[in-house]
């Protein structure tokens, strides 16, 4: 393990454009597994520094899609730049409103399920760090309706749904007993 203080994480959060992040000299589990032939994917909130040297593709992941820092650090807060949605190392969209934010869990889930299907015949490591249940709280309307307007409950239920979708993909591909 690694205590946060050992690598300069002294209680301050990594803000967009900051100079701090996961030290590139640290060896991650993704880097170790890659040396053993694993495909590696990360889909969701990274929040370990948004400089390219800190991002998932520089830390042992073959694939990445998600947000580079917390979903409360977005232009809706006015003091932060637009929150990018990144694939690989490229921003392919920006989170500009609550409707965009409500799609983050589903997007990570869809990427994870696709990754499982594409790598079903070889070893893989899948890391899915959801931004839920973290404020600000946004969720897809159908989930909010099902949760009777309770947004915290809706976010918990969506993460539960996501886990179920990932487990279903493993079962569908005959991998459930090989994890």
Which residues fall in each region the model found?
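Formylglycine-dependent sulfatase
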Residues: 1-179
